[in-house]
């Protein structure tokens, strides 16, 4: 049995926090992208935070999720931050160059 993948979005002032839960793969990421993008475009935050603390598994789709939200943050004039990454996931993100796009 696989854990349900979902996002819990919290907005405080101009800070947008997307708390991700479950496994991130090519099957589960698209609905998360759509929900995050719709809420961010509606609220136009100055800071966009992706919290990976609730993520149990992530394939390269997680990198794609970050890259797409970086582009969205650029459109909004917002800063992108990543938090809650495991040491292994953080290293993979760094190898992929995500530390050039987002603050960890």
Language model features: what each stretch is:
Residues 23-101:
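Amphipathic alpha-helical interaction surfaces in cytosolic regulatory modules
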Residues 1-19:
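Short beta-strand/loop segment at the start of cytosolic alpha/beta domains
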């Amino acid at each position: 049995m696989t854990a349900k993948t979902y996002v819990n979005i919290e907005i405080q002032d101009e800070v947008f926090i997307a708390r991700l839960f479950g496994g991130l793969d090519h099957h589960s990421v698209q609905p998360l992208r759509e929900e995050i993008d719709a809420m961010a475009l509606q609220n136009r935050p100055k800071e966009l935070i992706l919290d990976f603390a609730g993520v149990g598994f992530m394939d390269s789709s997680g990198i794609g999720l970050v890259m797409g939200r970086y582009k969205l943050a650029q459109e909004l004039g917002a800063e992108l931050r990543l938090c809650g990454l495991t040491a292994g996931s953080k290293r993979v993100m760094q190898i992929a160059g995500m530390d050039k796009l987002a603050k960890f």
